[in-house]
From Swiss-Prot:
The active site is at residues 95, 135. This is Flavohemoprotein. Heme b binds at residue 85. Residues 150-255 form the FAD-binding FR-type domain. Keywords: Detoxification, FAD, Flavoprotein, Heme, Iron, Metal-binding, NAD, NADP, Oxidoreductase, Oxygen transport, Transport. It comes from the Bacteria. The lineage of its organism: Bacteria, Pseudomonadati, Pseudomonadota, Gammaproteobacteria, Enterobacterales. Is involved in NO detoxification in an aerobic process, termed nitric oxide dioxygenase (NOD) reaction that utilizes O(2) and NAD(P)H to convert NO to nitrate, which protects the bacterium from various noxious nitrogen compounds. Therefore, plays a central role in the inducible response to nitrosative stress. The record marks 84, 388 as: Influences the redox potential of the prosthetic heme and FAD groups.
Length: 396
């Protein structure tokens, strides 16, 4: 554990960190990628370009400094990051590289003196050991499961199915013909790619979209404007191609008893982890109320509508409601949605009034903030609201 002097020294730097903001982590990443360019094969460079990862790292550093006397308060964040790290196959020696560049960044930007650098070195060492220990546990758990594996494993694309104008699903089965590890509904799969034309290896996480079956995996990918990986998958990946996958991971998952009511609330491609949850609830014959609330721009980009309806018909207590923000004339003629405009949960208050109900949210951050605010205003306990951010985590 850290001594009182080290803690006091680290906490004394908080005002400087806050004043500097993400400029600190921008300098850190620029320095690290200059001296250790091999790490570009691991980090999501798209998140570097748009600044999301720099902001996320700064928030993590500031949170650590603020809670250095209360490390248990950081454990939920540690779990989220450790799960993601295993999908990137982060190794203990890479923490030494990060530590070196973090201390060098503090020195180059602030010239704080050796006492401060030594204190931050000790503090970083404690945090790094927490991550290394937890990630070793996750790696062991993944390798020890039936159908589990270490590192990455080659899988063949056995199905590629357009689901909307923007979303395509991909099904994978292992090249070795063996079984595959189970996962919790809501978790994601690590997809490792370096096809011809890519400057660096690219690693992405995509939510698994159905109940585990031990035979293979299914994900669904939204084609993003300018998205290197999503566009390659949509336009160039074909049935028969081989990709490498890291084992399922993630701290966002559904774990409820059969008599626990559930609401699955999503927008756009945020429905993907919800599909795995709904599929699981349906196949396990969930007896309590299940709600499926989904928002989409219109019918052209609304994926998996038929699958959701089919699964819903197998549940004894199922309510579905779909909002289209800007429905097309065809949508209005066919009446394939329930409400026009933004999601308004107050109209469905009776369906979400059970105090035991668990709420799972996924979609753009602004949407989740909007939905969570409505839920709280309707009397839902914050502890019953669970959410997943695609990309670096943000607090709602």
């Amino acid at each position: 554990m850290l001594d009182a002097q080290t803690i006091a020294t680290v906490k004394a730097t908080i005002p400087l960190l806050v004043e500097t903001g993400p400029k600190l982590t921008a300098h850190f990443y620029d320095r690290m990628f200059t001296h250790n360019p091999e790490l570009k094969e691991i980090f999501n460079m798209s998140n570097q370009r748009n600044g999301d990862q720099r902001e996320a790292l700064f928030n993590a550093i500031a949170a650590y400094a603020s809670n250095i006397e209360n490390l248990p308060a950081l454990l939920p964040a540690v779990e989220k990051i450790a799960q993601k790290h295993t999908s990137f196959q982060i190794k203990p020696e890479q923490y030494n590289i990060v530590g070196t560049h973090l201390l060098a960044t503090l020195d180059e930007m602030f010239n704080p003196g050796q006492e401060v650098l030594d204190a931050w070195g000790k503090a970083y060492g404690v945090l790094a050991n927490v991550f290394i220990h937890r990630e070793a546990e996750i790696y062991h758990e993944n390798a020890s499961k039936d159908g589990g594996w270490e590192g990455t494993r080659p899988f063949r694309i056995v199905a590629k199915t357009p689901r909307s104008a923007l979303i395509t699903s991909f099904e994978f089965e292992p090249v070795d013909g063996g079984t595959v590890a189970e996962y919790r509904p809501g978790q994601y799969l690590g997809v490792w790619l370096k096809p011809e034309g890519f400057a660096h290896q690219e690693i992405r996480q995509y939510s698994l979209t159905r109940k585990p079956d031990g035979k293979g995996y299914r994900i669904a990918v939204k084609r993003e404007d300018g998205g290197q990986v999503s566009n390659w998958l949509h336009h160039h990946a074909n049935v028969g191609d081989v990709v490498h996958l890291a084992a399922p991971a993630g701290d966002f998952f559904m774990n409820v008893a059969a008599d626990t009511p559930v609401s699955l609330i999503s927008a756009g491609v945020g429905q993907t982890p919800m599909l795995a949850m709904l599929d699981t609830l349906a196949k396990e014959q969930h007896t309590a109320q299940v709600n499926w609330f989904h928002a989409a721009e219109n019918g052209d980009v609304h994926a998996f509508a038929d699958e959701v309806s089919e699964l819903g018909r197998t549940l004894p207590r199922f309510t579905a409601h779909t909002w289209y923000r800007e429905p097309t004339e065809a949508d209005r003629a066919q009446r394939v949605f329930d409400s026009e405009g933004l999601m308004d949960l107050s109209k469905l208050e009776a369906a979400i009034s059970d105090p035991a109900m668990q709420f799972y949210l996924c979609g753009p951050v602004g949407f989740m903030q909007f939905a969570a605010k409505q839920l709280v205003s309707l009397g839902v306990n914050n502890e019953n609201i669970h959410y997943e951010c695609f990309g670096p985590h943000k607090v709602l």
